[in-house]
């Protein structure tokens, strides 16, 4: 549903946070590592709920999660919690089933704490001219290599001109996202992000240029970089 000119879209946010982040090599799941006095997950939630169009955040956590309910954000009436699944798409579907009614759904990584409000505003603007949705992304700048399958030997250099790094948030019409995720999961498709489910069903989401400092904390070295970027963000925005 396209938002009419001058009309604010109704949006709910989903944060899949059921993963354990094994590549971080930490005792805590990565979303519970901290920047300042808040976890990565709290920073991600805060950045979304700052925007007046986003009325609710649904967090999908593991059934074994023993950390979320200790966080102050767990008491926020705008935050709902659902038990997630073993893969991202299952967690997103679980959140969609319990979320309040809304025309649009925004999905954001729980370990991506450095979202700028300018990026979020640019993404939400697309609801005025698309019935599908889109995602924040950055053009690939480095030279890209493809390896032989199962090998660390270069097979080819990949043309980077039309390649983009997919980021989050990703924003889609709610009913369309549900339909595409259900079909992709039922047919055994590989769904690495929400956009890939829509692509599988023949839709073409929009790429919305975003900032390169909107990083996802995946490896140990990412946390120090995220802390630096967040310190810069705190100097320019009210966080």
Curated annotation (Swiss-Prot):
It comes from the Bacteria. Transmembrane segments: none annotated. Its EC number is 2.7.7.60. Keywords: Isoprene biosynthesis, Nucleotidyltransferase, Transferase. The record marks 160, 216 as: Positions MEP for the nucleophilic attack. HAMAP family: IspD. Belongs to the IspD/TarI cytidylyltransferase family. IspD subfamily. This is 2-C-methyl-D-erythritol 4-phosphate cytidylyltransferase. It comes from Sodalis glossinidius (strain morsitans). The lineage of its organism: Bacteria, Pseudomonadati, Pseudomonadota, Gammaproteobacteria, Enterobacterales.
């Amino acid at each position: 549903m396209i938002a009419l000119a001058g009309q604010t879209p109704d949006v709910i946010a989903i944060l899949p946070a059921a993963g354990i982040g094994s590549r971080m090599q930490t005792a805590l799941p990565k979303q519970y590592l901290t920047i300042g006095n808040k976890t990565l997950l709290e920073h991600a939630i805060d950045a979304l709920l700052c925007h007046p169009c986003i009325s609710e955040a649904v967090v999908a956590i593991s059934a074994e999660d023993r950390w979320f309910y200790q966080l102050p954000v767990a008491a926020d009436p705008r935050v709902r919690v659902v038990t997630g699944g073993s893969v991202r798409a299952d967690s997103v579907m679980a959140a969609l089933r319990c979320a309040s009614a809304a025309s649009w759904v925004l999905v954001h990584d729980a370990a991506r704490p450095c979202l700028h409000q300018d990026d979020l505003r640019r993404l939400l603007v697309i609801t005025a001219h698309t019935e599908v949705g889109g995602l924040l992304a950055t053009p690939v700048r480095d030279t890209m290599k493809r390896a032989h399958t199962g090998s660390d030997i270069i097979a080819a250099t990949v043309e980077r001109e039309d390649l983009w790094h997919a980021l989050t948030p990703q924003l889609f019409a709610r009913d369309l996202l549900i339909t595409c995720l259900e079909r992709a999961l039922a047919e055994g498709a590989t769904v690495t992000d929400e956009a890939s489910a829509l692509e599988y069903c023949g839709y073409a989401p929009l790429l919305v240029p975003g900032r390169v400092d909107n990083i996802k904390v995946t490896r140990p070295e990412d946390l120090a970089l995220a802390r630096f970027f967040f310190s810069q963000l705190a100097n320019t925005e009210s966080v």
